[in-house]
Amino acid sequence: MTTSPRALLLDVDGTLVDSTYVHVWTWHRALAEAGAPVPFVEVHHRIGKDGSTLVGELLDIAGVDDDEDRDRVAGRAKDLHSEYYAEAGDSLRLLPGARELVRGAKEQGWVTVLATSAPPSEFAEARELLDVDDAVDAVTTGEDVDTAKPDPTIVAIALERSGVDAADAVMVGDATWDAVAATKLGIRSVAVRTGGIGDAELREAGFSDIVDDAAGVLDLLSSGRL
């Protein structure tokens, strides 16, 4: 008797790579320099969300109302964020158990997909750091979609590339938007705490399980709880 293959759809930023607070800092700095200062907490709770949506919401908070001003400030902030994030590349590190999770899942027969909507340049840094291409079956990047999470399209593409049905897939992420997107597609989702979001928010977003980090996800896999 053969069993159907299962797919592990892995968010990257904040889940496998310790980049959440790098994004918080660089967006915060970029918005302030572009003329739209906002509190750090407002940036943090939007990390992982589609970039244009993130910026639009933060411009609302900053009180930038004029359409022409919004376009100018948004464009400048996005350019600065890309610049500052690239400068911070040397500070990126893997999160606990990241590489082991990808390799362990593959060894256990899972189809593994790096399901990110990061720009290709940012993903390339993370991919090099992870060094698990031989254990990855498919990837996505921001080039695959017009709008990122919580819009489910990027997760739908990751699922399609896995060749597995939604009922046999699990999404792993650190942000509420990962669960929102997965739930829309009928995909179970598991949260890691490495993005700095509290358990109550993660549960409310729809995550079925919450663990400390990628190592905890591997424990779930190895014990048959996923």
Task: Identify what each model region corresponds to.
Residues 1-6, 103-106, 119-226:
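Asp-based, Mg2+/Mn2+-dependent phosphohydrolase catalytic module
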Residues 94, 115, 147:
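Residue-level marker of regulatory loop/turn positions in helix-turn-helix DNA-binding domains and
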